[in-house]
Amino acid sequence: MIINSISEFLQAADIKKQILGIDFGEKKVGVAISNIEHTVAMPLQTILATNQDRVNKIQEIAVAYNIGAIVIGLPFKLDGTETSQTHRVKDFANKLANKLLLPIFLCDERLTSKAANNLLKIGNIKRKVRNAIDDRVAASIILEGALKRMQNSKSYF
């Protein structure tokens, strides 16, 4: 089930379980995971696979970690308009929703990839390593933003 509002997401999610965060890209998909208390988002892995294989890999992760919900970053232009990548992410989210019986929250992800890259640069991480892990770091930034929105929501408590 695809969800666009944090209050609906909180009603649908099993908040006693960890949440998965996803930064979808054509070549790489970054994956992050929350702790059980939903206070921290941690980079988990980067998936390099085709569309259906990506869905299968995420399903494997969801089962292995007993995930209660998923957050997927939804890219927009700075002015809030959709891009071709926005539509690809929505298509991917629909495929994932058809495969998994978990609530999926589509969360605005403007500038998260840039923030992830800048964060890794500040840490003096070499470019080759940055390129290998930037998607999972972006996924953790996306998930962290959703976790903060959850904590700020009155329906969370």
From Swiss-Prot:
<dbReference type="Pfam" id="PF03652">
    <property type="entry name" value="RuvX"/>
</dbReference>
<keyword id="KW-0378">Hydrolase</keyword>
<protein>
    <recommendedName>
        <fullName>Putative pre-16S rRNA nuclease</fullName>
        <ecNumber>3.1.-.-</ecNumber>
    </recommendedName>
</protein>
<dbReference type="GO" id="GO:0005829">
    <property type="term" value="C:cytosol"/>
</dbReference>
<dbReference type="InterPro" id="IPR037027">
    <property type="entry name" value="YqgF/RNaseH-like_dom_sf"/>
</dbReference>
<dbReference type="InterPro" id="IPR005227">
    <property type="entry name" value="YqgF"/>
</dbReference>
<dbReference type="InterPro" id="IPR006641">
    <property type="entry name" value="YqgF/RNaseH-like_dom"/>
</dbReference>
<keyword id="KW-0690">Ribosome biogenesis</keyword>
<keyword id="KW-0540">Nuclease</keyword>
<comment type="similarity">
    <text>Belongs to the YqgF nuclease family.</text>
</comment>
<keyword id="KW-0963">Cytoplasm</keyword>
<dbReference type="InterPro" id="IPR012337">
    <property type="entry name" value="RNaseH-like_sf"/>
</dbReference>
<dbReference type="GO" id="GO:0000967">
    <property type="term" value="P:rRNA 5'-end processing"/>
</dbReference>
<dbReference type="GO" id="GO:0004518">
    <property type="term" value="F:nuclease activity"/>
</dbReference>
<comment type="function">
    <text>Could be a nuclease involved in processing of the 5'-end of pre-16S rRNA.</text>
</comment>
